[in-house]
Amino acid sequence: MSSEKMPIETLQADEHRFAIILGAGAAGIIQGCTFIREKTLPLEEFQILERQSAFGGVWWKNTYPGAACDIPSHEYQISFALNPYWSRTFAPQPEIQKYFEDVALQYELHKSTTFNTEIVEAKWDDSRLLWLVETTDLTTGDTKLWSCHVLIGALGAFTVPKKAPVKNVDAFKGEEWHSVDWPKNANLKGKTVAVIGTGPSACQFIPNIYPEVKSLIVYQRSPGHVLPRNDVVVGSLTKWMFAHIPFLMRFNRWFWMKKDEILRPRLFTVGSWLQKIVISMTRNHLYKQIKDDTLRRKLESKDVFGCKRPLMLSDYYPIFNNDNVELVTDSVTELTENGIKSRNTDTGEEMERETDVLIWGTGYNPVDFGLPVPTKGRSGQLLCDKYQPELFSLYGVAVDDFPNYFNFLGPNSSSFETSVMELFELQAHHNSIATEYLFQKNVGTFRYAIMPKEERVRSWTLSLRPGQAKLPPANPNCKSYYRSKIGHVYRYPYPYWQYKALIAKLDFKRDWVLLQQRIGQKEVKVLEF
């Protein structure tokens, strides 16, 4: 089948499921498990479509040296699938990927998952009140058209890698890659290596590649706040106790999450007593590991705490004490065939440094919500364009003009206060409630869909703006992916119990409209609840 000659809405689907989940990472796995646990849908009624060849999402894809969780393992796990056997306080990438894969297999999600599948386009078909999803099999090149009532975007925020906006970005002739595409056969032994970017991923792999390289050049735009990692091996006695006395494991997780719930709002309040203490800790950590005053000035963050994601690393700073490591704080301006040009912002002097290997540690584009899958709503507008530039959404899970569409980690839903795993579980439950309603409603001679009210989407988002303006990333000097393209902070700013209460149930009368269509007819009625 080929959809190149005609619009996909004119074609008949090859496969139909009631719900399709895009992505088999943590969010997609939690959504599938929630469907099963809450008896929303049986396995045969939903399908997970995944580009990679295994479960795990970013934890399958990111295999760079030193890849690990920067959140303690006992917090970075699913509440209904606690793992008593974490090896360390901060588990490494292979262990985390296996954990998510094991959870997926436990709930038999492999029976409803199609791997090696590129989503070409997802489009709402108003003539049938269905989503149409075109895919390509990456192993055979075959295309397929799926249809579904409910479409759930579980692709996460860290799927679209970015590079620095520099001149002649494709000019470099040496070896080059982004941290997310780390080659399995990468050989850095005896080579000069340049790293552009000092975000969370770069700060993890830099200490791990240093022993191999001849020399290392690190280009830093602005330093972040760094705290000691305090990563320790979990003892066999602790593992035994967690495995055989599950209450202790649950209490341990509850204790640390409750601590975060109490302390994090204060930590991310600008000028708070706790923030001042933690900033002092970051300075002491830097001064203990770096003795050179010039290096200290380069590595000490000038940002308000919380502008960027704080880092927890104990092996990062010492790398810069070595003679064969150069920290460059000039602005990268251009790539050449043999290296990188940068300009000193004070003197205007430009300098080229040659390198054998260039590694991009510049992270992702989390603010480009709706990417990388082209997803079109009722009007034909792309989801990524619908969100921009104001980032309006309903609770970060839905948006007007996109019926029966739900996603994870959308605008204005993440918070400094809580773990992303808890957020995924909250949003999966919300999506499950909506799906159950639609599953029960779509029987008989009518089809139904639900869609957020435009005025509610706007009013809820705008109600967050006063609180968001007080968050650390709102500082005018802060350059952060926590801000939209026009400067709005898109994190939830208020006590998180309020968000939990909002998303725990669906208020159909306040938030939603009902689309109704008699099967076989094209007229769609928009009804109030």
From Swiss-Prot:
Binding site for NADP(+): 68-70, 198-204, 221-222
Stated induction or repression of this protein's expression: Expression of the botcinic acid clusters genes BOA1-13 and BOA17 is coregulated by BCG1 during both in vitro and in planta growth.
Pfam families associated with the record: FMO-like
Top-level taxon in the UniProt lineage: Eukaryota
Cofactor: FAD
Signal peptide residue numbers: none
Entry-linked InterPro entries: FAD-bind_Monooxygenase_sf (IPR051209), FAD/NAD-bd_sf (IPR036188), Flavin_mOase-like (IPR020946)
Gene Ontology MF annotations: flavin adenine dinucleotide binding; N,N-dimethylaniline monooxygenase activity; NADP binding
Function: FAD-binding monooxygenase; part of the gene cluster A that mediates the biosynthesis of botcinic acid and its botcinin derivatives, acetate-derived polyketides that contribute to virulence when combined with the sesquiterpene botrydial. Botcinic acid and its derivatives have been shown to induce chlorosis and necrosis during host plant infection, but also have antifungal activities. Two polyketide synthases, BOA6 and BOA9, are involved in the biosynthesis of botcinins.
Family listed: Belongs to the FAD-binding monooxygenase family.
Protein name in UniProt: FAD-binding monooxygenase BOA2
